[in-house]
């Protein structure tokens, strides 16, 4: 090539898909797009669904819960907000509805560790009545709330883990107290929720760390 003005550009980055996921997750918090809240709820039927309804107009990125022995439990909630003003409005809404909460958005332990550790073993009251299911549903606004509404509040949820990873489908892990003699009734109930599930009660990972 002659009589041409050329510009050489050297570009590159020491990055892979694993690091890219970390960058995306931390940039959501750094740019104030994602907020992390620890919210206290009473351990009574219907309180889990009531909390989910508080976020009907927001995109939930995370929803983690484990039933405890005490009268109250804590739910770790991740939520995307348009701006700081909308986040303030959301906090006011929670307060008016009687929810006590703590903002963990800038808490390093929460961001680096806690969000991956919420869980623990079931309490003695659950015993062998807890059943674990793994499922997924299309990732779209309102999908999580829709599932919880279809599931209802007559059956007690003992464990719940949901994390929005930006894929086409959202994956959830749910623990349910089942005291029915006919164990097929719970399967039929889940089928009506519009979400496909696989039972994981015998999964060794569950037995070793969550049961």
Predicted features, each with a name:
Residues 1-26:
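Catalytic phosphate/nucleotide-handling subdomain of diverse soluble enzymes
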Residues 17-211:
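A conserved regulatory-domain signal marking ACT and ACT-like small-molecule sensing domains
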